[in-house]
């Protein structure tokens, strides 16, 4: 499907969960001849990341309102109006055929600006429960898509765009059948780490002994303390790294993952075809719980919510999964994934632009 001469503006910012899926769709459409620009904020990760991908970025000034106090709330309408005006000027100059909102604060004023100029708005909600910005924008959007069922009552479920190196991994049957020895447990806390996993997993390792080998991603600044915790638990052999640059290689190595359940993490684990023990971050709206629930329902994962998390709960869960069980769960995870999510989102953008 050629997009020769068509123009897209992607609105996404703040976290990797918004920015990476946006980049996947942008690259897919650029390969079809689309011109793509980005709308973001200058003080968040998109400011550095997007230009590295060869995409020009425009900035508006906007930030979140949660927990900002009464003064910020009083000033909010003026700040939103100014951000809307900035976005409108940017879009008037660029003249996109369609805008794609992938979440983050920037999508709110950006979506309103597009709508006020008669530019179609396409939305993609990455999480199992819709964010505030997308709830508002859904009322004016031409098309709304969701990664998981339940964020919006009638939106099409298209999955989350996932990195191509994860999609290219061999299927679970090819990867896991015939594996022997200790079960390989990948612990992922995200770039900031997950303190609860850093505290719990060394004790889990002590309980499980030689039956597991662990690769633990501790997050920024925590590697030494986590290594020390494993050593003090009599388990110094396990590997601890601050970050994992090649997640596809880590997924290929693993038999099972213990992690938070951010939207992109859940989608990557499903695409990789891996069983998981999810410990959702305690958001007020239980966003990460709803992200993980479809995989638990599919028999591919177990959720332990943080108040119920203990060394015994994790150790008993992992010890209760035989290699046969892990392979079955891995196959169910892969079956529940939507590997062509990038194409599905890109196709809707193209369809709306042609309408």
Swiss-Prot record:
InterPro entries: GlcNAc_MurG, Glyco_trans_28_C, GlycoTrans_28_N. Cell wall formation. Catalyzes the transfer of a GlcNAc subunit on undecaprenyl-pyrophosphoryl-MurNAc-pentapeptide (lipid intermediate I) to form undecaprenyl-pyrophosphoryl-MurNAc-(pentapeptide)GlcNAc (lipid intermediate II). Strongly prefers UDP to CDP, GDP, ADP and TDP. This is UDP-N-acetylglucosamine--N-acetylmuramyl-(pentapeptide) pyrophosphoryl-undecaprenol N-acetylglucosamine transferase. One of its GO terms (cellular component) is plasma membrane. UDP-N-acetyl-alpha-D-glucosamine binds at residues 15-17, 127, 163, 191, 244, 263-268, 287-288. Changing residue 288 to A: 114-fold decrease in kcat. Changing residue 268 to A: 1.6-fold decrease in kcat. Its main location: membrane. GO terms for molecular function: UDP-N-acetyl-D-glucosamine:N-acetylmuramoyl-L-alanyl-D-glutamyl-meso-2,6-diaminopimelyl-D-alanyl-D-alanine-diphosphoundecaprenol 4-beta-N-acetylglucosaminlytransferase activity; undecaprenyldiphospho-muramoylpentapeptide beta-N-acetylglucosaminyltransferase activity. Disruption phenotype: Inactivation of the gene rapidly inhibits peptidoglycan synthesis in exponentially growing cells. It is found in: Cell inner membrane. Homodimer. Associates with MreB and MraY. PANTHER family: GLYCOSYLTRANSFERASE, UDP-N-ACETYLGLUCOSAMINE--N-ACETYLMURAMYL-(PENTAPEPTIDE) PYROPHOSPHORYL-UNDECAPRENOL N-ACETYLGLUCOSAMINE TRANSFERASE 1. Keywords: Cell cycle, Cell division, Cell inner membrane, Cell membrane, Cell shape, Cell wall biogenesis/degradation, Glycosyltransferase, Membrane, Peptidoglycan synthesis, Transferase. Pathway: Cell wall biogenesis; peptidoglycan biosynthesis. One of its GO terms (biological process) is carbohydrate metabolic process. It comes from Escherichia coli (strain K12).
């Amino acid at each position: 499907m050629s997009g020769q001469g068509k123009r897209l503006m992607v609105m996404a910012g703040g976290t990797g969960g918004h920015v990476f899926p946006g980049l996947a769709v942008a690259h897919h459409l650029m390969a079809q001849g689309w011109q793509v620009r980005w709308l973001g904020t200058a003080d968040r990760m998109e400011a550095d990341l997007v230009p590295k991908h060869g995409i020009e970025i425009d900035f508006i000034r906007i930030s979140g309102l949660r927990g900002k106090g009464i003064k910020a709330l009083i000033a909010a309408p003026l700040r939103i109006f100014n951000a809307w005006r900035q976005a409108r000027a940017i879009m008037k100059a660029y003249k996109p055929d369609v805008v794609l909102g992938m979440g983050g604060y920037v999508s709110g004023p950006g979506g309103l600006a597009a709508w006020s100029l008669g530019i179609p708005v396409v939305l993609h909600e990455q999480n199992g429960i819709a964010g505030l910005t997308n709830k508002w924008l859904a009322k004016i959007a031409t098309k709304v898509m969701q990664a998981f069922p339940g964020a919006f009552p009638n939106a099409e479920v298209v999955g989350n765009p996932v990195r191509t190196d994860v999609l290219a991994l061999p299927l679970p049957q090819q990867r896991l059948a015939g594996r022997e020895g200790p079960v390989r447990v990948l612990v992922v806390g995200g770039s900031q780490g997950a303190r609860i996993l850093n505290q719990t997993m060394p004790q889990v390792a002590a309980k499980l002994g030689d039956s597991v080998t662990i690769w633990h991603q501790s997050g920024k600044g925590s590697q030494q303390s986590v290594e020390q915790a494993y050593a003090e638990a009599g388990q110094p052999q396990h590997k601890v790294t601050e970050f994992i640059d090649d997640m596809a290689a880590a997924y290929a190595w693993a038999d099972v993952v213990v992690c938070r359940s951010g939207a992109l993490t859940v989608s990557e684990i499903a695409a990789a075809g891996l069983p998981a023990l999810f410990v959702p971050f305690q958001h007020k709206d239980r966003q990460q719980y709803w992200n993980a629930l479809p995989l638990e329902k599919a028999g591919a994962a177990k959720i332990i919510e943080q108040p119920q998390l203990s060394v015994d709960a994790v150790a008993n869960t992992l010890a209760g999964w035989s290699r046969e069980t892990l392979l079955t769960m891995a196959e169910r995870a892969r079956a529940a994934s939507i590997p062509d999510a990038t194409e599905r989102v890109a196709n809707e953008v193209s369809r709306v632009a042609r309408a």
